[in-house]
Regions:
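Alpha-helical transmembrane segments of polytopic membrane proteins
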Residues: 5, 61-69, 137-148, 199-205
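Conserved small/polar residues in nucleotide/adenosyl-binding loops
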Residues: 2-10, 222-228
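Extracellular-loop-to-transmembrane junctions of the mid-late helices
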Residues: 5, 109-153
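Interfacial "cap-and-anchor" motif at the non-cytosolic start of specific transmembrane alpha-helices
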Residues: 45, 162-224
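Hydrophobic alpha-helical transmembrane segments of multi-pass membrane proteins
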Residues: 5-53, 60-77, 96-112, 174-190
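Alpha-helical transmembrane segments in multipass membrane proteins, preferentially the mid-helix core
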Residues: 13-16, 74-78, 142-165, 211-213
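Membrane-interfacial loop-to-transmembrane-helix junctions in polytopic alpha-helical membrane proteins
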Residues: 23-27, 53-59, 88-91, 133-140, ...
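Membrane-interface helix-boundary motifs at transmembrane edges
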Residues: 18-31, 80-92, 160-170
Length: 232
């Protein structure tokens, strides 16, 4: 069942990524990048969860963690282009991109260095991961991701309070999904379960973002987009 669920989610994420291609506008471009990275992250998750080789599993886990760095950046840019926030922090964005590049290298190289984590055993239901919890890169990775998520959540709270109903519904759905995922991730961070909450949430977020940004039209707005008899 778990394998089937992963297949279905990957197919849906792939469809969202393909359908995002060719859409016009900066926000649509950010959605395309987010969908693509989320899809690639899902592939690494699938290999991590179901390929029974410690070296491959270690590499895929590192690549999966590297994807998180770029997903939070893309989520920040999505927030910027959908809400208008985060425009005047160019230096911060450059610092985030540089950190993500270095962190991605460290996470992928972990398959040889084991500076962040080591996978000691793979069973049918568990993957035993031993994190280097006092290590700089372990702490920096998780602290960076959690801080960015908290900032984005605060931004959406601000926008929900001031936006019209048309936009507030979108912000509320994204906020609730991200907030629930954040809490679940904090609650299960020490779990040895194969299923990584972060990847599941980012995958679910990719489908919600695609739908709300490029597909969703409220019933009250359909008269603005449906063709009239004269147009038909």
């Amino acid at each position: 069942r778990g394998l089937g669920d992963v297949y279905k989610r990957q197919v849906l994420m792939g469809i969202c990524a393909v359908k995002s291609f060719g859409k016009k506008g900066k926000l649509a471009e950010i959605v395309l990048y987010y969908e693509t990275v989320a899809f690639v992250c899902g592939i690494f998750f699938w290999l991590y969860a179901f390929y029974p080789d410690i070296k491959v599993t270690t590499f895929c886990k590192g690549a999966e963690l590297a994807c998180y760095d770029w997903l939070v950046i893309l989520l920040m840019y999505y927030t910027q282009y959908s809400t208008g926030l985060f425009k005047g922090i160019r230096a911060v964005k450059i610092a985030m991109i540089l950190f993500s590049a270095v962190d991605s290298f460290v996470m992928i190289a972990n398959v040889w260095t084991h500076k962040v984590f080591t996978i000691s055993e793979i069973t049918n239901s568990d993957i035993i991961i031993e994190y280097v919890k006092d290590g700089f890169f372990y702490r920096a990775h998780f602290l960076y991701n959690y801080i960015v998520i908290v900032v984005i959540l605060i931004a959406f709270i601000f926008m929900i309070a001031k936006a019209s109903r048309f936009y507030s519904f979108r912000y509320e759905v994204i906020f609730i999904t991200l907030f629930v995922g954040f809490i679940l991730d904090l609650a299960t961070v020490r779990s040895q379960s194969i299923y990584d909450i972060s990847t599941l949430i980012y995958g679910f977020m990719s489908m919600i973002i695609y739908y709300l940004t490029l597909s969703y039209i409220p019933v009250s707005y359909t008269h603005l987009t449906l063709p009239t008899n004269r147009e038909v």
